[in-house]
Amino acid sequence: AAPVYTNPAMAGTGSCGGGGRVVLNYRNQWPSLPGTFITTAASYDQNFDKIGGGVSLLILDDRAGEGLLTSQSVSAGYSFQMPVNRRFTMRFGIEGQYGQRSIDWAKLRFEDQIDPSRGFVNATKEQWSSDQVGYVNFAAGVLGYSERFYFGLAAHNLTQPVQSFYGNPGAIIPRRYTAHGGLVIPLDGRKNPESTISPNVLFMMQQKFTQMNIGFYYNKGPLVTGLWFRQTFGEYGNSDALMALVGFRKDRFKFGYSFDLTVSDARAAAPTSHEISAG
């Protein structure tokens, strides 16, 4: 995923030589299931010394059930850069977001449409008030990093906006908390960025759902590979998936393909997911 999606404090951390960072993501979740679960994202971030930090823009589109339910959002963020010393820097980020959810009621099927002999042929008498709802949302985060390690904390959906098509005040987007960190270890014992291993962990919590991804990147020249394990905890806890990545990098450009292999009880119906990223 885009770094600024994980933590708004990461805005500006990808700048190199005064330039910015563009990241594009496409994810197809469980393509073997009926319907589609597709997420597309595009982000840009850049550091500006004149304003003491970085800015970011993130556009997200999520589609479920062959367009039955869609969500779009646009987020803009700023991270304040605070050098602690020559080797270690802190960043404090904030982000504002406008989001919109839409539902295509015509693709839903209701009980009163069923004819015992002919199936779904009748017109429904169900009434709905709206097919679209918009909301304003906010996030904040903190990041500490050096050349060889990083760690961060972030909180999303701070205002817990209502996302109900019927105005139900209880249908909120719950707060999401994220903790993440990692190391960059040169494999030849010297400061050689061409050959490194980077163990990392990401921990997310949202209401009763808790998830941890743990694994590593391996970089050798232009080659980038990685392997992670995803575990969920609590009421919905299980060993969820293995994730593998292969890609390459050239100067500032990176391209990667990742493959999720489900290892939980859902693997028979939803064995795989696929994601492509470039930036």
Residue ranges and their predicted role:
Residues A1-G279:
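Subset of outer-membrane beta-barrel
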